[in-house]
Amino acid sequence: MNYAEESLKLHRRWRGKIEVNATVPVSSKDDLSLAYTPGVAQPCLEIQKDPAQSYELTRRHNLCAVITDGSAVLGLGDIGPEAGMPVMEGKCVLFKAFGGVDAFPLCVRTKDVDEFVQTVYNISGSFGGINLEDIAAPRCFEIERKLKEKCDIPVFHDDQHGTAIITLAGLTNALKVVGKKKEEVRVVTSGAGAAAISIVKLLLSAGFRHVTMCDRKGAIYQGREGLNWIKEEMAAVTNLERKGGSLADALVGADVFIGVSAPGTVTREMVQTMNHDAIIFACANPTPEIFPDEAKAGGARVISTGRSDYPNQINNVLAFPGVFRGAFDVRASDINEEMKMAAAAALAGLISDEELTEEYIIPKAFDPRVGPTVAAAVADAARRTGEARI
């Protein structure tokens, strides 16, 4: 199938992938008076007395805003807010289909961090959660941090945390397949954008000890010239031996490669220099850092990509619907590291040790267990860590 042509036809036919539906009937004078004036004044007064009643008397309890500035849309780059709308609509469809979450797309016309933050904060009272989407790094880190400080609802940048959750889940099972321990393996990442940094942070939180990040200039280490503030922050907690060199240099003897960077950055020869039973997560889309057949030829044991036409797809739809479902179910005030790690552990646990193989380390997107299992784990973690409000 030519997905580009067929998708364009679908969008022309439907003129959008979402719509607003009423949950109550308006077919009589009494219906109208209850749904709107004069009856609607009473729930307004209840919410005025206690704003938390907005979760009980409106759709806020299940409503997520999917918000972008259009600056880093898929692999298309800075295409602007209007052009980002099809992706935001698509995200809303996935929220509903896989998590039962009502989501609404919002494309904001500003690249100014404070203006974006204030805009989102000003409308946050209408929503139970905020999903940030397709915002360029390093601006996305500052936006998320500031919104988390200001808002009392979950703020979650899926390009960071959804990818990190799935990666941790897949890597947990991949290590079982090859019989290695997270505390001992050497992990090398390619890329230092939103996804890579969040992946590394979550791996460190989960107990991985030996991680080196690489960008276009090679290994990132404390004291390297030209690092921006977020790379300096990561340099303080990774590559503690402060080794320089290229990506190829960093991969020598490494156990795990995680790529969220650019096509073709890894060769068969580079994989051959890695430790035995190497694990390769080549997640650049649509063309990975190295194709699975080349990685296999180089000696890799377990290989994952971001593509659906190869085994072990890293697909964020495995995470964000269930994460928000779980957060909403307990009216969480935040989505913290413990909740993300719980989501990853739940995903990994859906595949039994007997089922695990080199080509089956991550559940399939349409596995009906995924959403409910992730949601339950996230809700439990929210309760344990004091984020739950009901």
Describe each region flagged by the PLM.
Residues 1-155, 375, 381, 388-389:
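N-terminal ligand-binding/catalytic initiation module
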Residues 12, 55-60, 96-97, 122-124, ...:
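Solvent-exposed alpha-helices and their adjacent loops that cap or buttress functional pockets
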Residues 69-71, 79, 108-109, 134-137, ...:
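Short, ordered loop/turn segments at secondary-structure junctions
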Residues 74, 79-99, 157, 161, ...:
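Glycine-rich phosphate/diphosphate-binding loop of Rossmann-like nucleotide-binding domains
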Residues 105, 131-134, 155-158, 189, ...:
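General beta-strand structural signal in soluble alpha/beta enzymes
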Residues 158-159, 178-180, 282-390:
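Adenosine-phosphate binding glycine-rich loop
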Residues 232-301, 307-309:
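Rossmann-like adenosine-cofactor binding region
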